[in-house]
């Protein structure tokens, strides 16, 4: 009977999530309806070592959820400044980096020695966005290219 009542759900993409929540009760299962595109996530890691970003060019897809991980493998403090990429965007930032914001969004993240920051966001526009470290004497630069779709990535 339940299957017959839920037949209309079959064409949808579903994600089942098991939880233990004091609000709902132990062992409760929460069903979350989410389209596949919202669940799919691209992961990109930018490492900092010997005062260089690697890779120094990163490709992303507009509208696709992205988990950008920045790892400082150096023995000194560094900064990550994504110019124009994350303005007016919803961000989820975690890790031991220190994010700095302005009224239009993320300005930079300071990364301590062996530090790491994860930024989850959805690129909202295509284009080429530089990123760099603005600490004195650090001439580290890179580029994030946001493509309109996967077919545009070489």
Where in this protein do the model-derived segments appear?
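N-terminal edge beta-strand
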Residues: 37-65
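Short aromatic-acidic-glycine turn motif
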Residues: 86-97
């Amino acid at each position: 009977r339940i299957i017959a009542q839920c037949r209309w759900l079959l064409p949808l993409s579903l994600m089942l999530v098991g939880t233990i929540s004091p609000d709902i009760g132990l062992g409760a299962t929460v069903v979350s309806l989410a389209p596949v595109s919202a669940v799919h996530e691209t992961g990109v890691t930018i490492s900092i070592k010997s005062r260089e970003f690697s890779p120094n060019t990163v490709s992303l897809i507009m509208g696709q959820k992205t988990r950008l991980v920045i790892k400082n493998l150096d023995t000194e403090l560094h900064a990550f400044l994504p110019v124009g990429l994350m303005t007016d965007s919803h961000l989820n930032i975690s890790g031991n980096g220190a994010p700095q914001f302005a009224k239009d969004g993320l300005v930079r993240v300071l990364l301590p020695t062996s530090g790491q920051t994860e930024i989850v966001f959805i690129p909202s526009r295509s284009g080429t966005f530089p990123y760099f470290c603005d600490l004195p004497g650090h001439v580290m630069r890179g580029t994030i290219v946001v493509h309109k779709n996967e077919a545009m990535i070489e």
